[in-house]
Curated annotation (Swiss-Prot):
SUPFAM superfamilies: Tetrahydrobiopterin biosynthesis enzymes-like
One biological process term in Gene Ontology: tetrahydrofolate biosynthetic process
Gene3D superfamilies in alphabetical order: 1.10.286.10, 3.30.1130.10
A Pfam family: GTP_cyclohydroI
GO CC annotation: cytoplasm
Family to which this protein belongs: Belongs to the GTP cyclohydrolase I family.
Pathway(s) per entry: Cofactor biosynthesis; 7,8-dihydroneopterin triphosphate biosynthesis; 7,8-dihydroneopterin triphosphate from GTP: step 1/1
EC number(s) per entry: 3.5.4.16
Protein source organism: Mycolicibacterium vanbaalenii (strain DSM 7251 / JCM 13017 / BCRC 16820 / KCTC 9966 / NRRL B-24157 / PYR-1) (Mycobacterium vanbaalenii)
The encoding gene: folE
HAMAP family: FolE
Stated name of the protein: GTP cyclohydrolase 1
Catalysis: reaction(s): GTP + H2O = 7,8-dihydroneopterin 3'-triphosphate + formate + H(+)
Length: 202
């Protein structure tokens, strides 16, 4: 498997190996003491493999490609999309963490913007891979800085981690908040405060 490390995305050129994934799930069922040939589990390896192909679909698509389309709107004020539903997978335990992402940017001097759905799509593609929330937040911000050439970017993610809710410390409902600020949002306190006020306002 070859990977590109030319930016913070991790993209694989390999295709999803359905047969290998099915075999791995079957072995896991045996390892925990189950019978993978009993009626309820007979098709489970194939179902789980297909599910993981979807859950990790972001490994096979470069999020930068999503941001190629730009529109000349001569817009010089903040663009913010709030409460983007987000599902990802903790790379430490391979269980879900889920919540919402808030993504904002100030267009560059050329006033060009990208489609609002593209921001949600970038969140989705970075989330659909083995992740940690801190890295996910930064990757989204860096992709926007890299492709949109904006004056500033802010990304805030609020998520519940099932690895904290289902096992270990077992604290369901605990929410982890991470942020990444770039450009003007990092250097200008007023811009950052305005963005955070809009994000926190319900």
């Amino acid at each position: 498997m070859t990977r590109s490390h030319n930016h913070s995305a991790t993209i694989t050129t390999a295709r999803f190996d359905q047969a290998r994934a099915e075999a791995a799930v079957r072995e896991l069922l045996i390892a925990v003491g189950e019978d993978p040939d009993r009626e309820g589990l007979r098709d489970t390896p194939a179902r789980v493999a297909r599910a993981y192909q979807e859950i990790f679909a972001g490994l096979y698509t470069d999020p930068d490609e999503v941001l190629k389309t730009m529109f000349d709107e001569q817009h010089d004020e903040m663009v913010l999309v709030k409460d983007i539903p987000m599902y990802s997978t903790c790379e430490h335990h391979l269980v879900s963490f889920h919540g919402v992402a808030h993504v904002g940017y100030i267009p560059g001097v050329d006033g060009r913007v990208t489609g609002l759905s593209k921001l949600a799509r970038v969140v989705d593609l970075y989330a659909k891979r083995p992740q940690v929330q801190e890295r996910l937040t930064g990757q989204i911000a860096d992709a926007l800085m890299r492709r949109l050439d904006p004056r500033g970017v802010i990304v805030v993610i609020e998520a519940e981690h099932l690895c904290m809710a289902m096992r270990g410390i077992r604290k369901p409902g605990a929410v982890t908040t991470t942020s990444a600020v770039r450009g003007q949002f990092k250097t200008d306190k007023a811009s950052r405060a305005e963005a955070l006020d809009l994000i926190l306002r319900k």
